[in-house]
């Protein structure tokens, strides 16, 4: 419902049709849980574009339907699953199967992230979109920016710092060494 509101869909529901399964040649890549999620998405999404007409040359309802499918596919790529239903469901099934309450927490987090100002990845995606590029190329630009160590990559670095500090016998010394210049 939030995407429909942000996309100004009116009565159209671009999520009405099920997203379908992965194309046969892409299924092994899209569901390879040994690949890091961002790498899996960056490798698969450009190839998915081969199966979709140029999204910016289509009418508005078609563009929204392409975007809805791509949104579901992107979520499925995050957890190496097949695209399905609302975006929060495959995430819940991968992270905490059967956790209905957890599903609502995931959905709420996604709602909070839906319109989150202009960060680096959103800016990169908007620049690419402004050229009339395929929607899949636009998403790839955002993901490429997200992969940088000063944007999405910072999360992995922060997690490693917290884990290292938790495992250290001298937390203050560990953090001081990590933050020392050079």
What are these model-predicted stretches?
Residues 1-182:
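Hydrophobic alpha-helical bundle cores within soluble ligand-binding/oligomerization subdomains
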């Amino acid at each position: 419902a939030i995407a429909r509101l942000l996309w100004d869909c009116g009565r159209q529901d671009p999520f009405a049709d099920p997203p379908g399964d992965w194309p046969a040649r892409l299924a092994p890549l899209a569901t390879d849980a040994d690949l890091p999620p961002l790498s899996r998405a960056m490798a698969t999404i450009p190839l998915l574009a081969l199966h979709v007409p140029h999204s910016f040359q289509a009418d508005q309802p078609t563009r929204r339907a392409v975007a809805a499918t791509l949104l579901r596919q992107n979520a499925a790529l995050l957890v190496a699953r097949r695209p399905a239903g609302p975006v929060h469901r495959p995430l819940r099934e991968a992270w905490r199967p059967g956790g209905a309450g957890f599903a609502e927490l995931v959905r709420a987090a996604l709602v909070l992230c839906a319109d989150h100002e202009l960060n680096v990845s959103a800016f990169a995606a908007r620049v690419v979109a402004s050229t009339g590029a395929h929607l899949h190329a636009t998403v790839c630009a955002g993901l490429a920016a997200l992969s940088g160590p000063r944007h999405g990559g910072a999360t992995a670095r922060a997690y490693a710092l917290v884990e290292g500090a938790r495992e250290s016998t001298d937390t203050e010394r560990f953090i001081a060494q990590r933050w020392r210049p050079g």
